């Protein structure tokens, strides 16, 4: 029963998700977590960070109280599940959330990002990501450092973004080879 848990940070940090379970190897896990009650969780920092084999169905989780998703899927190289219906309206930090992901290209266009303040390195080395996020509300974002750096495929319009409160965009598109959009 996970209904009372508020902090899931680093829960599966560098865990091996596969179809082998051994009591001698604590890091191995392949249980179904799709029905976990996440309704009281506020911190998902690094929850699946480095879990390179994780690709579980977690799209129905109620994460409406979560405020921090820093490095949530950082290095979860095969993760590519539908999380389009996640309520991220209370999240303030999504830095490194999809960094070093090789497969993620989910539709997250309708996420309510109005409370997010930091998007640093959000898609840093995000190999497959090329979804349209032009409708995101960035009115509270302060920092977007290296947000799309080293993305391989990203080339979507961002002309609807209000970046008037952003104070740091250092290296935002550094080595984003495909990006070629009008930012005027």
Which residues does each PLM region occupy?
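Negatively charged
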Residues: 1-184
């Amino acid at each position: 029963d996970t209904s009372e848990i508020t902090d899931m940070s680093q829960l599966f940090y560098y865990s091996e998700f596969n179809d082998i379970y051994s009591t001698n190897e604590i890091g191995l896990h392949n249980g179904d977590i799709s029905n976990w009650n996440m309704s009281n969780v506020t911190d998902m920092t690094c929850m699946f960070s480095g879990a390179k084999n994780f690709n579980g169905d977690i799209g129905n989780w109620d994460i409406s109280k979560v405020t921090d998703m820093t490095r949530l899927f950082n290095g979860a190289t095969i993760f590519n599940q539908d999380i389009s219906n996640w309520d991220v309206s209370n999240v303030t930090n999504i830095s490194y959330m999809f960094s070093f992901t090789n497969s993620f290209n989910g539709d997250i266009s309708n996420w309510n990002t109005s409370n997010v303040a930091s998007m640093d390195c959000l898609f840093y080395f995000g190999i497959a990501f090329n979804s349209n996020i032009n409708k995101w509300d960035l009115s509270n974002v302060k920092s977007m450092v290296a947000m799309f750096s080293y993305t391989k495929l990203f080339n979507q319009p961002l002309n609807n973004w209000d970046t008037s409160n952003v104070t740091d965009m250092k290296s935002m598109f550094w080595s984003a080879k495909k990006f070629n959009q009008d930012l005027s």
